[in-house]
Design a protein with these regions (language model features):
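Histidine-acidic metal/acid-base catalytic patches
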Residues: 2-27, 40-43, 116, 135, ...
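Structural motif corresponding to the early beta-alpha repeats
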Residues: 72-207, 218-219, 270, 335
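Short, acidic/polar
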Residues: 51-61, 83, 127-134, 281-288
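A cross-family glycoside hydrolase active-site/sugar-binding cleft signature
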Residues: 47-51, 72, 98-101, 146-148, ...
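Active-site-proximal loop/turn and secondary-structure-junction residues that shape catalytic pockets
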Residues: 52-54, 75, 103-106, 149-153, ...
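C-terminal segment of N-terminal export signals and the immediately downstream linker at the start
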Residues: 30-52, 59, 68, 392
Length: 392
């Protein structure tokens, strides 16, 4: 080895050590500061589900003017170090990370945990995994996570093509194809778990869970927004949806938690699926929980009609005027993130490309910018400017 090569190797090792020590210092700093919720700047933040930090994707998101991202995770990256690495990757590219995952651990998904919602074998193990997940987020300086409490998954019956020619996920409660799915499992009627549960059981199980979560979330400095049932219904396949399918249930659930760290992730699309049975439209939900600083995240989505039969739509193509939601968010001074939700595919033929997402017919992993994301972000930004009363 030449003298020059030796010097280069030593330099490389020093640079590697700097990076490693920097990451360790950041992790330690985040951990020591975890008793306080990480600072999130005021104001509405329009972001996206970020996907993978590939060169093409990062460039596309920059071109769209995106700053804030909501990210996924896998069991392999579900550690404090893994979350910190994800955060650093995105921050190095100029983005800011609002949340990573909706609960993920060694056993897989920690979201819609049937063991927790229905008190099935393995409940305490799942809860401990979830608590560790929240601790890891806090140590990595991630301020937020979404949680959902459905016991038998998200229910759909297929996809339908809308009059404008794109396709959306749909649910027809009268269809024999209606079923719930989550984390690779399928749930069907008449009884998804062999018996009918009572509302009292569902409430007892929620209370047991949230009382364990609150002190950990507060210590970690992580806010948790609870997602509505998708779809809202009094009961599906023997499992009551009595908590997060209606306004009064949400109020009681947040009161039971009694913590500044527990609030609402309002998925507008899911809520609109329920229609009048929810007891409050999205604007009423926003005004109640937003005025109490209990509104942490918004999924901006519309649907064609309330149940018994709906199809997910573009935000300007459903039955609800989404500009009302934006105005309400401005009125309550919402300061969380809002993202386009369940973005359909545009610029392709759903009849020939399957699922309407433009995925078929091209090599796996090939990047394809979805025009729908650009369209939805443009709509959302225009609505926000109008709601804020800004003039050109």
């Amino acid at each position: 080895m030449t003298k020059s090569e030796t010097q280069n190797n030593n330099t490389a090792r020093r640079e590697f050590a700097k990076v490693a020590l920097g990451g360790a210092a950041l992790l330690a700093s985040a951990g020591s500061a975890s008793a306080k919720m990480p600072m999130v700047p005021p104001g509405i933040k329009i972001g996206v589900s970020g996907g993978q930090p590939t060169e093409d994707n990062l460039l596309y998101l920059k071109q769209l003017g995106v700053t804030w991202v909501s990210l996924g995770a896998s069991p392999a990256t579900a550690t404090a170090e893994g979350f910190l690495k994800i955060r650093e990757q995105w921050e190095a590219a100029g983005f800011k990370v609002y949340n990573i995952g909706s609960g993920v651990g060694p056993s897989g998904s920690l979201h819609n945990m049937e063991e927790v919602t229905l008190n099935l074998p393995g409940r305490d193990k799942k809860i401990e995994e979830y608590l560790n997940y929240i601790r890891y987020l806090g140590k990595a300086g991630i301020p937020y996570s979404t949680y959902a409490h459905m016991g038998n998954g998200i229910w759909r019956s297929g996809r339908e093509i809308l009059p404008r020619g794109y396709s959306g996920s749909s649910l027809d409660l009268s269809s024999p194809d209606a079923k719930g799915t989550w984390a690779g499992k399928t749930f069907t009627g008449p009884l998804s778990h062999g018996r009918e549960y009572t509302k009292e059981e569902i409430w007892e199980n929620y209370t047991y869970f949230i009382k364990k979560v609150v002190p950990v979330a507060e210590e970690a400095g992580v806010r948790i927004g609870i997602h509505p049932d998708d779809p809202p219904q009094p009961m599906l396949a023997g499992v009551p949806r009595c908590i997060f399918s209606n306004f009064e249930g949400y109020k009681r659930a947040i009161e039971i938690a009694n913590s500044p760290n527990i609030g609402v992730c309002l998925c507008c699309g899911s809520w609109l699926e329920g229609g009048k049975m929810t007891g409050a439209d999205p604007v009423e939900m926003i005004k109640y929980f937003g005025s109490r600083k209990k509104l942490f995240k918004i999924h901006f989505r519309n649907v064609s009609a309330p149940l018994p039969h709906f199809t997910e739509t573009m935000i300007d193509d459903g039955y609800y005027d989404m500009s009302k939601i934006m105005r309400a968010l401005v009125e309550v001074k919402f300061d969380g993130i809002m993202i386009p939700d369940h973005v359909p595919g545009l610029g392709s033929n759903p009849k020939t490309e399957g699922a309407g997402r433009g995925a078929a017919g091209r090599p796996p992993g090939e990047f394809r910018a979805n025009p729908a994301l650009a369209y939805l972000l443009g709509c959302m930004n225009a609505m926000l400017i109008a709601a804020q009363g800004k003039k050109g």
